[in-house]
Structure formats: C-alpha cells, structure tokens
UniProtKB/Swiss-Prot annotation:
Keyword Transmembrane helix included in the entry's annotation: no
Function: Catalyzes the reversible reaction in which hydroxymethyl group from 5,10-methylenetetrahydrofolate is transferred onto alpha-ketoisovalerate to form ketopantoate.
UniProt catalytic activity: 3-methyl-2-oxobutanoate + (6R)-5,10-methylene-5,6,7,8-tetrahydrofolate + H2O = 2-dehydropantoate + (6S)-5,6,7,8-tetrahydrofolate
Subcellular location: Cytoplasm
Source organism of this protein record: Heliobacterium modesticaldum (strain ATCC 51547 / Ice1)
Coiled coil feature spans: none
Organism lineage string: Bacteria, Bacillati, Bacillota, Clostridia, Eubacteriales
Protein EC: 2.1.2.11
Cofactor binding remark: Binds 1 Mg(2+) ion per subunit.
Binding site for 3-methyl-2-oxobutanoate: D46, S47, D85, K115
Protein known as: 3-methyl-2-oxobutanoate hydroxymethyltransferase
GO molecular function per UniProt: 3-methyl-2-oxobutanoate hydroxymethyltransferase activity; magnesium ion binding
C-alpha cells in the first residue's frame, strides 16, 4: 500500500517516467482491496451502469447513482486518489450545471476529481470547472456516453483527419486545465504521439503501451464476466468460474444437509442441554 498520490504528483510521475495505475471500483469491498494494493488511482466509472446496475449503456446512469457509489469507495480507499465520472447529462447542458453537479459529487461523496468525456468542444466546460476549483480528468477517443454518435464501440482516430482531431482535443483539454487525460480505443502510435505532445499524463485503455498509465474495469481484470472479453483486456484471474463453483458447492451442501456442520454451529452450556 503506497502513500496517497496527489494531483501534482501525477504530473511529476510523468516527468520521472513512472507509470500510473488506475482501476475502477464501485463499492466498499473492492475499494478496500484496491487500497491495499500498489494502484494509485480508483475511477468510479459510469461503467457501473453496465457492470453493476445492468443497463445496456452508461447513458441511463444518474448523478444520484454516481454519488451513491462514490461514497463507499471513498470510505474504503482512504490511501488512494478517487476520481469519478460525471454522468451523461450532468455536465453537457451548461457550464453552470456542470459546476453545480461536480460540486455535489465532491461535497457529498468525498471524491477528489471528476472525469468528463469530450475534447475541443468540452474544453470550455473543463476550464469553467477548473476555475471553480474542481480538478478534472479528460477523456478522448472512444467516449462511451456518445458511442452511438461515433458509430458504436469501435477504434477511433484511424484516419488522418480523425487522428489530428484527437491530438487537437488532447491539447485543448490540457490548455483548459485538465490534470490528466484518458485515451480510449485508439491506435497505439497515435496514443504515443498524443502522449509525447502533452505535459500532463495520459492513461490508456485500449490505446497501447505508450501512455503514461493504464486503466481497466476491475471486473474485467478479475475475469468475473467471461462471456465477452474486449481485445484490450488482460484477465489476471478467472474469478467468475470460481465464484459460480463456490455458489454451486454451497447450494449442494445445503440441499444435502452437509452445511452447516458441527464446526459452524453453536453449542449449549451443560446445564441447559437437558432442557432443549
């Protein structure tokens, strides 16, 4: 368990050539486990909509749902920097809305920074948030909240024009005051160029090895959901099958009267045994 990293230290780590490690968490138990690891940053992602709440996308996630999940994560990870996604509709209506809603997230949950999706068009909102004292992490490339507008969940920046736009997006977010930028699902060479063009750290997901850090969804990393594994995911464990096996063992032992056994039961004092 490392000492809690500060926002300025994120930038300093880039200068020193050190990699940032970020992982999602949505509840207290997983936050505790991450806090006991060497990972520096927890992202309470709006991916919880699909991973935890069973929605088809991140779009239905509400501000109240994000705050609800941020609270236990902050309590479970006192030694880890906690960043949270601003959900769709909470920051893209007006700058005033964005500031109001980001303030709610910080005040009510205890997170230290917010993440917003979008590039050049979102830069004025990022600047407004930063000027209001709210630290912001940017997010470019595949932006799940607007995936339909991008043609679905697919690699971005594959043409010269699209690649140039992503570079301009990153530079605009840096100029607006973002302390770091997530780059999602872009070619590795483009991510390398963007990373080299910025003084702030980039954190990749499906963006190759040249970013200043990496992020994964914790359920993907642990192999909990094994029906679909994105190309960019490495499963460091296969806990889904292990969990199912444990549940079936429990069900079988209860049905067979094996559990609970004597070792899981409470005894009675000698003077009471004859009464019951």
């Amino acid at each position: 368990m490392a000492k809690k990293i500060t926002l300025p230290q994120c930038k300093e780590m880039k200068k020193q050539g050190k990699r940032l490690r970020m992982i999602t968490a949505y509840d207290y138990p997983f936050a505790r486990l991450v806090d006991e690891s060497e990972i520096e940053i927890i992202l309470v992602g709006d991916s919880l909509g699909m991973v935890v709440l069973g929605y088809d996308s991140t779009v239905p996630v509400t501000l109240d749902e994000m705050i609800h999940h941020c609270k236990p994560v902050v309590r479970g990870a006192p030694n880890t920097l906690v960043v949270a996604d601003m959900p769709f509709g909470s920051y893209n209506v007006s700058k005033e809305d964005a500031i109001r809603n980001a303030n709610r997230m910080l005040k009510e949950s205890g997170i230290e920074a917010v993440k917003v999706e979008g590039g050049t068009r979102m830069a004025p909102t990022v600047r407004a948030l930063v000027d209001a004292g709210i630290p912001v992490m940017g997010h470019i490339g595949l932006t799940p909240q607007t995936a339909a507008q991008l043609g679905g969940f697919k690699v971005q920046g594959k043409t010269e024009d699209a690649a140039q736009q992503l570079l301009e997006d990153a530079l605009a977010l840096e100029s607006a005051g973002a302390f770091s930028i997530v780059i999602e699902c872009v070619p590795a060479g483009l991510a390398r160029t963007i990373t080299a063009s910025l003084s702030i750290p980039t954190i990749g997901i499906g963006a190759g090895p040249y970013c200043n850090g990496q992020v994964l969804v914790i359920q993907d990393l642990l192999g909990i959901y094994d029906r679909f594994v994105p190309k960019f995911v490495k499963q460091y464990a296969q806990t889904g099958p292990a969990i199912r096996a444990a549940l079936n063992d429990y069900a079988r032992e209860v049905a067979d009267g094996v559990f609970p056994g004597p070792e899981h039961s409470f005894g009675m004092d000698d003077e009471m045994k004859g009464l019951y």
